[in-house]
């Protein structure tokens, strides 16, 4: 028995063996590479638009790294980049998305600026806004969405001449707070990110996104 005023034992310091994740569940190898030598780091908190922020994005140019005050969103960045790349396929990973941003992506698809769009969202997104999950599937295709436990926000915009990778703190919604982004025409990183998503699309049943919470939890517990 513990003394009357003794602190309870810290479970983080217990002698039990730590949980081990089988590395074989990660199909895509880790990408290791040196820090890019060509980077443009800018404070874009005074930029008036996403188009202004990515004005120096070039196919053979440097990586753009910036901070915003939330004056433009991830969907604004995607739209501005598409104005440079021309029609392209889009892949998105986000913890959440606003209906207005989903509508913007649909407008880009209908206008031909997006040729294909696939969505990786957090499993809680399905419980929070199930109507948006159904709308994404209905608007972008039956195979357009997968779920996992994720907080990663990234996107790829690819066609025959551009392979743009976007890494950001932004979800696919309007958030008037300081946000960060890293954007560049980066074939190597695009291949890696696309490989991660392709593994998920190949291994997860397409209907899991609209399954019950217990079904999703059980599947993710087994398959990760």
Cite the ranges covered by each PLM segment:
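Primarily the HKD phosphodiesterase
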Residues: 72-140
């Amino acid at each position: 028995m513990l003394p009357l005023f003794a602190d309870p034992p810290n479970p983080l310091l217990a002698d039990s063996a730590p949980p081990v994740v089988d590395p074989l569940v990660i199909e895509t190898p880790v990408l290791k590479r040196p820090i890019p030598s060509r980077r443009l780091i800018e404070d874009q908190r005074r930029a008036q638009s996403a188009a202004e922020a990515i004005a120096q994005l070039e196919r053979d140019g440097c990586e753009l790294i910036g901070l915003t005050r939330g004056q433009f969103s991830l969907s604004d960045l995607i739209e501005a980049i598409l104005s440079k790349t021309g029609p392209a396929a889009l892949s998105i990973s986000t913890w959440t998305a606003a209906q207005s941003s989903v509508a913007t992506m649909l407008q880009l698809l209908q206008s031909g600026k997006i040729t294909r769009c696939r969505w990786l969202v957090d499993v809680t997104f399905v419980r929070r806004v199930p109507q948006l999950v159904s709308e994404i599937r209905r608007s972008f295709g039956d195979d357009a969405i997968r779920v996992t436990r994720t907080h990663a926000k990234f996107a790829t915009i690819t066609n025959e001449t551009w392979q743009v990778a976007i890494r950001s703190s932004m979800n696919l919604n309007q958030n008037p707070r300081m946000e960060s982004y890293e954007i560049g025409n980066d074939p190597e990183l695009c291949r890696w990110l696309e490989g991660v998503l392709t593994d998920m699309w190949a291994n997860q049943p397409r209907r899991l996104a609209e399954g019950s919470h217990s079904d999703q939890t059980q599947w993710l517990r087994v398959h990760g």
